[in-house]
Amino acid sequence: MGRAFEYRRASKEARWDKMSKLFPKLAKAIQVAAKEGGTDPDMNPKLRSAIATAKANNMPKDNIDAAIKRASGKDSADIKNIHYEGKAAHGALVIVECMSDNPTRTVANVKAIFSKNGGEVLQNGSLGFMFARKAVFHLEKFAGDLEELELDLIDAGLEELEQNEEELVISGDYTAFGELSSAIEAKGLVLKKAGLEYIPNNPVSFSEEQLSDIEKLLDKLEDDDDVQAVYTNID
């Protein structure tokens, strides 16, 4: 997803009252990370990042602790990562990442959202060559020397570093997530959000009218309780 479009979406979402949906999604991400890699954040970089993302979104500590506790409970839900690919209006490409304890419900909901909003679900694997899987870290702006920071992080797997008026974005290959996460923490950078994202290899520009049509689908997807992230090839 193009950076300009990301910022447009972020500013739009900031105006919406999404906390009632956001906190459960953040809790689910924490629970899955803890279940997959252990409940000790010091030994689990994905859990550390999930916790940092939750804190950056003002999620209460009690909620965070409860999500970690649920992961180690005997009766914890079997939450699965589910991935869907599709097309939106005007041919925009869409990848949807979900976390769900009921895949049957999730696939029915996702297919319905696509079909009712001018899109269609594609066979998984159809868009694999159109996107690159990257470890992406969204951080508070850095006041120091960016060139020096870039050099310091290259050995940890840094591929791209970009700072704008709102934030610093650091990315690398998805396999470097843990190493990059540790290097960023060692530098004392303030994390806002981190995770594995799908970045379009060839972003496409759309008109404002077309974007308005496409966003109807994206909004509905993001509102679904099982949807964790939505990626597009929009520039």
Curated annotation (Swiss-Prot):
It comes from the Bacteria. Its main location: cytoplasm. GO terms for biological process: regulation of DNA-templated transcription. SUPFAM superfamilies: YebC-like (SSF75625). It is found in: Cytoplasm. GO terms for cellular component: cytosol. InterPro entries: Integrase-like_N (IPR017856), TACO1_YebC-like_2nd/3rd_dom (IPR048300), TACO1_YebC_N (IPR049083), Transcrip_reg_TACO1-like (IPR002876), Transcrip_reg_TACO1-like_dom3 (IPR026564), YebC-like (IPR029072). Gene3D superfamilies: 1.10.10.200, 3.30.70.980. NCBIfam families: PRK12378.1, YebC/PmpR family DNA-binding transcriptional regulator. PANTHER family: TRANSCRIPTIONAL REGULATORY PROTEIN YEBC-RELATED, TRANSLATIONAL ACTIVATOR OF CYTOCHROME C OXIDASE 1. Belongs to the TACO1 family. This is Probable transcriptional regulatory protein C8J_1116. It comes from Campylobacter jejuni subsp. jejuni serotype O:6 (strain 81116 / NCTC 11828).
